[in-house]
Amino acid sequence: MADITKEQVVSFIENMSVLELAELVKELEEKFGVSAAAPVAVAAAPGAAAGAAAAEEKDEFDVVLKSAGDKKINVIKVVRAATGLGLKEAKDMVDGAPQTIKEAMPKAEAEELKKQLEEAGAAVELK
């Protein structure tokens, strides 16, 4: 077996795009016959969870592309710039809307990306 360290694997995965990571997960699921789906937990009391969630202000956001709108080419350009994806991958992401463009972004960066996508003609949501 090659002398590849865990750190090298982690470093390689860190540099992958969201689309590449999704493809990797699918391949691993097929190869090992497993599922990456999280197990469903027993639901807690809804009143307590809602109060705690409202008390905490969210500091990381996911930018979700709801639809590309009429100016799909402009939206693809913004997606490419934001994600570093190639043209085909960015087009597939835009065509597959709703799609998460970027995850766990700081609020200011997420709002800036949302603004850029909306200016390009897309419908965007922050989660």
From Swiss-Prot:
Protein purpose: Forms part of the ribosomal stalk which helps the ribosome interact with GTP-bound translation factors. Is thus essential for accurate translation.
Gene Ontology BP term (one): translation
Annotated TM spans: none
GO MF annotations in UniProt: mRNA binding; structural constituent of ribosome
Family listed: Belongs to the bacterial ribosomal protein bL12 family.
Pfam families: Ribosomal_L12, Ribosomal_L12_N
Keywords recorded for this protein, A-Z: Ribonucleoprotein, Ribosomal protein
Stored PANTHER family: 39S RIBOSOMAL PROTEIN L12, LARGE RIBOSOMAL SUBUNIT PROTEIN BL12M
InterPro entries the UniProt entry points to: Ribosomal_bL12 (IPR000206), Ribosomal_bL12_C (IPR013823), Ribosomal_bL12_C/ClpS-like (IPR014719), Ribosomal_bL12_oligo (IPR008932), Ribosomal_bL12_oligo_N_sf (IPR036235)
Record-linked Gene3D superfamilies: 3.30.1390.10, Single helix bin (1.20.5.710)
GN (gene name): rplL
One cellular component (GO) term of this entry: cytosolic large ribosomal subunit
Record's protein name: Large ribosomal subunit protein bL12
Assembly and binders: Homodimer. Part of the ribosomal stalk of the 50S ribosomal subunit. Forms a multimeric L10(L12)X complex, where L10 forms an elongated spine to which 2 to 4 L12 dimers bind in a sequential fashion. Binds GTP-bound translation factors.
Record has Ribonucleoprotein as a keyword: yes
Cited HAMAP family: Ribosomal_bL12 (MF_00368)
